[in-house]
């Protein structure tokens, strides 16, 4: 690159970083008629949060307003902790034609996919989601974007990255619809493994290149044509190898599991969360509660795929309709039993930026608005291991704040229309300095 071009490029990049830094250095006082306390699940009136730099300095009606502070008064609104989505696919996107989208995603170069991923990340952040867990991304795109956001070179939510999801040959994590003559067979580096030692290697490969969490495919999925939804895709020995190795290195493990047997085997092997869980039995749900295993229900994925089933090939349409019919009953049982629940959408199956629709879907199957909000803040933060940093509005934590119009407990759909979003002290939506 020529010297003049280098200077121009650096001026753009450093200028963008400096702008963000200026936004995050001043003291800002955010006010609203009320604030949601994710510790107690109650509203506090009035809502006041004092932010200095990237951190919350003080919270609550008695918080002092420092002299010279910038004051943002949002009026009849509710302040909340920044939302957390525990299940997204940040490099994928869906529309009314899911299969067209899938093949477009497959044809992109990794560098090109990174640009799309940043665009989707910006839409997610603007929707009020200041932290996401990316559960499966090819070519290390999620790890790369996480690093760019941390460095201030890209804008987006805090990312907890899984890199490649791990599963068996021909399973949901494999590119099973493609003939071997057209697609290079995948290896443990890309997350495809067979046998305990191969699966242990797959875990090590993901961690070697930056995974914060490990994702496995324990059962079949909707968008993989050849695998039945309910059949386990990993043996007990493989599950124990994956989970044991990940835990040894301090990584949690999330299991994609629609089928009950697959989920139960994963729970018995020490899994940290079950994703989707469409066909979970009462017995498995009780076991999850007993062991403290989180359910990340991704109601959005079922809602979106069921409502778009007519546009899918017949094998996928059948599976989409099956999970739609079973998922609601499973959720009602999980809520009644008291299984720990963390908010997750599977965005990428549905469009990024629509994440907050999940709140309404959760309440439709019996969660209270308070419980749904706690699932997307305090509980999701615990599952992701970021609860010392975010998930509640408390002094010392990252200034991740969202405001929605009116009383959110009276109208949960207000979460879909944020008035104000702040991530790590920088204003993303709303009046900027």
Residue spans for each PLM region:
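Histidine-rich, glycine-flanked metal-binding segment
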Residues: 35, 40-80
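Active-site gating loops and adjacent loop-to-helix segments of metal-dependent hydrolytic enzymes
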Residues: 91-113, 169-188, 222-236, 291-325
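Histidine/acidic-residue-rich catalytic or RNA/ligand-binding cores of hydrolases
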Residues: 94-97, 142, 172-173, 224-226, ...
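His/Asp/Glu-enriched, well-ordered alpha-helical/loop segment
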Residues: 103, 248, 252, 312-315, ...
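Divalent metal-dependent hydrolysis catalytic cores, especially in the metallo-beta-lactamase
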Residues: 116-142, 155-165, 211-224, 252, ...
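Metal-dependent enolase-superfamily TIM-barrel catalytic cores that perform enediolate-based chemistry
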Residues: 185-269
């Amino acid at each position: 690159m020529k010297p003049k071009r280098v200077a121009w490029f650096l001026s753009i990049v450093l200028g963008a970083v400096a702008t963000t830094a200026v936004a995050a250095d001043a003291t800002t006082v955010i006010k609203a008629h009320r604030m949601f306390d994710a510790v107690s699940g109650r509203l506090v009136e009035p809502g006041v949060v004092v932010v200095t730099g990237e951190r919350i300095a003080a919270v609550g009606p008695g918080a002092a307003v420092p002299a010279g502070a910038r004051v943002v008064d949002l009026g009849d609104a509710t302040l909340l902790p920044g939302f957390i989505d525990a299940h997204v696919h940040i490099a994928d996107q869906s529309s009314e034609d899911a299969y067209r989208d899938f093949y477009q995603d497959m044809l992109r170069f990794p560098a090109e996919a990174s640009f799309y991923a940043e665009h989707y990340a910006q839409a997610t952040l603007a929707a009020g989601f200041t932290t996401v867990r990316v559960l499966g991304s090819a070519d290390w795109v999620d790890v790369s974007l996480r690093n760019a956001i941390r460095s201030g070179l890209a804008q987006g939510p805090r990312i907890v990255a899984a890199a490649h999801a791990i599963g068996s040959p021909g399973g949901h994590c494999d590119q099973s619809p493609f003939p071997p003559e057209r697609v290079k067979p995948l290896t443990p580096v890309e997350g495809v493994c067979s046998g305990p030692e191969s699966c242990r290697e797959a875990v090590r490969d993901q961690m070697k290149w930056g995974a914060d969490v490990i994702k496995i495919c324990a059962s079949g999925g909707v968008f993989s044509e050849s695998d039945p939804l309910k059949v386990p895709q990993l043996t007990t020995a493989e599950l124990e190898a994956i989970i044991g190795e990940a835990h040894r290195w301090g990584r949690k493990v999330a299991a994609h599991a629609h089928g009950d047997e697959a989920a139960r085997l994963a729970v018995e092997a020490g899994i940290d969360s079950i994703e989707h869980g469409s066909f979970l039995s009462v017995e498995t749900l009780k076991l999850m509660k007993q062991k403290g295993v989180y359910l990340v229900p991704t109601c959005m994925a079922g809602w979106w795929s069921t409502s778009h089933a007519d546009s899918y090939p017949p094998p996928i349409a059948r599976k989409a309709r099956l999970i739609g019919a079973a998922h609601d009953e499973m959720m009602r049982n999980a809520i009644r039993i008291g299984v720990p629940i963390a908010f997750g959408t599977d965005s990428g199956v549905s469009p990024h930026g629509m994440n907050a629709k999940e709140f309404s879907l959760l309440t439709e199957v019996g969660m209270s608005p308070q419980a749904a909000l706690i699932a997307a803040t305090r509980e999701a933060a615990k599952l992701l291991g970021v609860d010392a940093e975010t998930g509640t509005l408390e002094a010392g934590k990252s200034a991740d704040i969202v405001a929605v119009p009116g009383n959110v407990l009276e109208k949960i759909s207000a979460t879909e229309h944020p008035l104000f979003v702040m991530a790590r002290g920088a204003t993303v939506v709303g009046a900027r300095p």
